[in-house]
Amino acid sequence: MKNLTRRQFIKTSGLSIAMMGASTFPSLAAESKRRVVVIGGGWGGATAAKYVRLSDPSVEVTLLEPSKEFISCPFSNLVLAGVENLKNLTMNYTGLRKHGVQIRHEAAAAIEPDKQRVRVGMDYLEYDRLIVSPGIDFQWDQVEGLAEAKDTVLHAWKAGPQTLQLAKQLQSLPDGGVVVMTVPPVAYRCPPGPYERASMIAWYLQTKKPKSKLIVLDANKDIVSKTGLFKAVFKDYQNLEYRPAQKAEKIDVGSKEVTTDIGDKVKYDVINLIPPQRAAAIAVDAELVGADKRWCEVDHVTYESVKHKNIHVLGDSTIGLPVPKSGNVANSMGKICALAVTHLLNSKEPPVNPPGNVCYSWVSDKEAIAVVNSYRIENRKVVQIEQKLTPGKSVTVAQNSFGWRANIWNDILG
C-alpha cells in the first residue's frame, strides 16, 4: 500500500457516511419528540451524538460524559517519548453543542433497560433509544498485587494524567535502568498500541539513555497486529528485548519485580503494566456483556444489543470481531449506529453499512507504519474482505497520519 490518499481514507474508514452531510440523509419526519441518550463521549459516543442530530434534527440528544475534555488515546504514545504534547491531543465539546447536542458532564450511574431510563446522580433520563459507548475497564484482579498498587503502577492506557506521569518516570530513569512493559491477552483496546508504545520507548531510550533497555512481556504467543512490520522495527532496536507468551501474573512493588506465568521474575526500574480488559462497568452491570462476561454482543447492522432492545453498544466495549478495538472503528460505528437509530425511530428499515479501519503506528520520532482494513456485512455480521499494510516504516506515512487525525477529530467533534 502506498501513501494513504484522501479518497482511500474516505473509502476505508467509513467516512463516506460522514461526507454525505445532513442534507443528503433520508428525510425523516418527526412524529413526536424523541430522545436519544448517549453514554460516553469518546470516539464512538461523541460521533454518534453528532450524527443522530445530523440525520434527524428533530431528535433530542443528550450526551453523558464526565470529562469536560476529549483526550485522544491515538498519538498519546508519542507523548511518552517527548515527540508530542498532550495539549495537542486535548479538545473540547463545543462543536457538538453547535449541532444541538445537550451535554451533561456527569457519569451514568446505572441503566434500567426495562424502564428505558438511565440514572444520573439522583435523577433519571428516559430514552427512546440508548447508545452506550463507555470504553473499557481493567481487570485488576487478573494480576496478583495489582489492585493494591494500581495508583502507583501505571497503565497509561487511558490518555490523560497517567500519560504524563509515565513520561516523567521515563525521563527520571537513570541511564542503565530497566523499563518493563506488559501486553495483556487479547482482546484489548488498540491491538497495535502496546507495540507502538514499545517502539517509541525503545527509540527514546536509545536516544536519551543509551545504556538502558526495555523488556516487553507479551501475554500473547506473538505480536498480534502488524506482526511482520513490528518484528522488523524491533530488530532495529538492540535495547528492546521482546518475550512472547509471558503473561504478567504478579507484581511486587516493594522488590520492583514482575512474575510471569512461566515463573520468570523480572526486575524493573520503571514498570508499565497494561492490565487485562473488559467492557466498562456500566455495560457489565446492565448485563450487556456476552457469555465471556467481558464484551458486549451486538447486531452489526444497527449495533443494537442482543441482550436488551433499544440499547445500542459501540466501540471498544463490543466483541466487534473481526474489527479491532480502534478509534477509527468506533468513529465508523458511531455514524452507522446514528443512521440506524434515526431510521428505527421513524419506523424505517436501517441501511446496511460496514465499518472501516485505518490505523497508524509510530515507531520512531519521524517514522510510522499503517494498516487499512475493509469489511462487508454478511448475515448481520462483519466480515473482513481486505487488509493492506505499508511495506515498512516511513517518514511519509508518519506525515500522512497528521492529516488523518485532523480529519477524524473534526468528524467527531467539529
Each language-model region and where it sits:
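Glycine-rich dinucleotide-binding loop and its adjacent helix/turn
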Residues: 134-207
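N-terminal secretory signal peptides and thylakoid transit peptides that target proteins
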Residues: 1-20
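Internal hydrophobic alpha-helix adjacent to the cofactor/substrate pocket in enzyme cavities
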Residues: 330-354
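Beta1-alpha1 glycine-rich phosphate/pyrophosphate-binding loop at the start
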Residues: 30-102, 180, 185-225
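C-terminal auxiliary extensions adjacent to catalytic cores
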Residues: 372-414
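FAD-site-proximal beta/loop scaffold in flavoenzymes
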Residues: 148-175, 266-270, 274-331, 343
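A Rossmann-like FAD-binding core segment of flavoenzymes
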Residues: 101-110, 118, 125, 203-294
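Glycine-rich, N-terminal phosphate-binding loop of Rossmann-like dinucleotide-binding domains
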Residues: 13, 122, 134-135, 183, ...
